[in-house]
A protein has these predicted regions:
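Metal-cofactor-binding active-site regions of metalloenzymes
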Residues: 1-202, 211-216, 222-227, 232-250, ...
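Compositionally biased, low-complexity intrinsically disordered regions
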Residues: 349, 360-363
C-alpha cells in the first residue's frame, strides 16, 4: 500500500513551479496535447476520428510495458511533415514554461517516422529546429533534441540514427538515445553505432533499467553515458549502484510512468529514494504526458507525497536537473540575473540559463506554420 504524505499545499505547488528546472526525460510523440493528437488525426482520417479528449484520456490504460509500447506507436502515426514537429515542440514548450522549465532535452524517434512513413531526416530535423526557435521566442524555453533508436529495429538502423545525430548537431540535436522494449535487446547490440557517434562527439543517453533489471544498467554503462533514462532497477544490484556512483551517472526517473506501465506496482516500492540516499544523482521527468497524465510538476508532487522527498530535496533535484543538461545543448545560453543556478558542482561547463536571443545558425521559421502541415 502506497504511503501518502499530506501537505502538497497551493503554496508549495507554487514554490516548486517557480524553481528553475530542466526537463530531461520527455518524448515528443508522447507529449502531444490530446487536442493536437485528435486534430492531426482527423486531418488524415485516422483511427481516432470522431472521438473526444475524454475518451482519449480513458483509452490509455496499460496492461504492461509491452502494451504501452504498442499504443505509443499511435502517437507517432499522426506526424506527416515538418510543421507537425514544429507545432508539437512549440506546444510542449508552452506547457513546460509555467512549470519552471527553462531548458528541455526532448526525445524524438526520428527513425520510426522515417521507416514507417518515409519522412526524410532533413524534414524531421527542420521541423524540430523551427519549433525550438519559435519556442525560444515565444515561451523562453530552450529546447534541444535526443534522437533515439528503437530497440526493435536493427543495428543498421541505429547506425543511421547515429549519423543523423552527427548531422543534426548544428540544429539542436545533442545526443543519441535508445528506447523501446528492453528485455532481450541490451544496449550492447548497438555498440557499433554508439561508438561511432561517440567518436564524433555525440553522447549516448539510453533508456536502461526500467523493464529490464540491473544487468541492463550494467550493460549500458559500458558506453559511459552521462545519464540513463529510468535506471532505477540498478537498486537490485549493489555493485551496479556503486558503478553509478563511481561514474557520476544521472538517472532520469519518471515515477508516474513507471507506475502506469506496471514496472512498479506501487510507488511505495519505488527505489528512487534509496538510490538518492546512497548518493546517486537523480532527476525527475514526465516521460509521456499524453499517455500517463503526467507533467514535470506531477513528478515533483509524486516525489514529495509518495517517495519521501522533502521540499529541500525537490529544490536540490531541480538544481541537479540543470547541472545534468548536456553541454552541447547550451552554448549561447546565459545566466539570468539573480538566479542561483545551475550548481557549480559536477563540472558543469559555463553558465546556463535562458537564451536572450535565437541561437546562432537558427533557420528562418516563417515558412513552417505550426498550425497545419504542408
Amino acid at each position: 500500500m502506497s504511503t501518502h504524505r499530506p501537505g502538497w499545499t497551493p503554496e508549495l505547488a507554487a514554490h516548486v513551479a517557480g524553481l528553475p528546472k530542466a526537463e530531461l526525460h520527455v518524448h515528443l510523440e508522447g507529449a502531444l496535447r490530446p487536442a493536437t493528437l485528435l486534430d492531426l488525426d482527423r486531418r488524415d482520417g485516422g483511427r481516432f476520428t470522431g472521438l473526444d479528449e475524454r475518451w482519449l484520456a480513458e483509452r490509455f490504460r496499460f496492461r504492461d510495458f509491452r502494451h504501452f509500447a504498442d499504443l505509443y506507436s499511435t502517437c507517432t502515426d499522426v506526424f506527416r511533415g515538418p510543421a507537425d514537429f514544429a507545432r508539437a515542440v512549440v506546444e510542449l514548450a508552452e506547457d513546460l514554461a509555467p512549470q519552471g522549465v527553462r531548458y528541455a532535452e526532448v526525445t524524438c524517434s526520428a527513425i520510426t517516422h522515417h521507416r514507417d512513413r518515409g519522412l526524410p531526416f532533413d524534414e524531421i530535423v527542420d521541423g524540430l529546429w523551427a519549433g525550438a526557435c519559435q519556442a525560444l521566442d515565444g515561451s523562453g524555453v530552450v529546447v534541444r533534441f535526443v534522437l533515439d533508436h528503437v530497440r526493435d529495429l536493427s543495428a543498421e538502423d541505429c547506425l543511421r540514427t547515429a549519423e543523423w545525430c552527427v548531422r543534426g548537431r548544428g540544429r539542436g540535436v545533442v545526443a543519441l538515445g535508445l528506447g523501446g522494449y528492453e528485455p532481450g535487446r541490451p544496449a550492447s547490440l548497438f555498440a557499433e553505432a554508439v561508438r561511432w557517434a561517440a567518436e564524433r562527439g555525440v553522447p549516448f543517453v539510453p533508456h536502461a533499467g526500467e523493464a529490464a533489471g540491473a544487468g541492463a544498467v550494467r550493460d549500458a554503462l559500458r558506453f559511459d553515458p552521462p545519464r540513463l533514462g529510468h535506471g532505477f532497477r540498478a537498486a537490485e544490484d549493489p555493485a551496479v549502484v556503486d558503478a553509478l556512483l563511481d561514474r557520476g551517472v544521472v538517472l532520469e526517473v519518471c515515477p508516474t510512468g513507471n507506475l502506469r506501465t506496471g514496472v512498479v506496482a506501487d510507488l511505495a516500492e519505488h527505489p528512487v529514494r534509496r538510490l538518492r540516499d546512497r548518493g546517486v544523482r537523480v532527476v525527475l521527468g514526465s516521460d509521456d504526458p499524453l499517455l500517463f497524465g503526467s507533467t514535470a510538476l506531477t513528478e515533483y508532487r509524486q516525489a514529495y507525497e509518495h517517495l519521501g522527498f522533502s521540499a529541500d530535496d525537490l529544490a536540490a533535484t531541480a538544481r541537479e536537473s540543470l547541472g545534468a543538461a548536456l553541454p552541447d545543448g547550451v552554448p549561447g545560453v546565459v545566466r539570468v540575473p539573480g538566479d542561483d543556478w545551475p550548481p557549480a558542482a559536477h563540472g558543469t561547463p559555463g553558465d546556463k540559463g535562458v537564451a536572450t536571443s535565437r541561437p546562432t545558425g537558427a533557420p528562418p521559421v516563417g515558412g513552417i506554420a505550426t498550425g497545419q502541415s504542408r
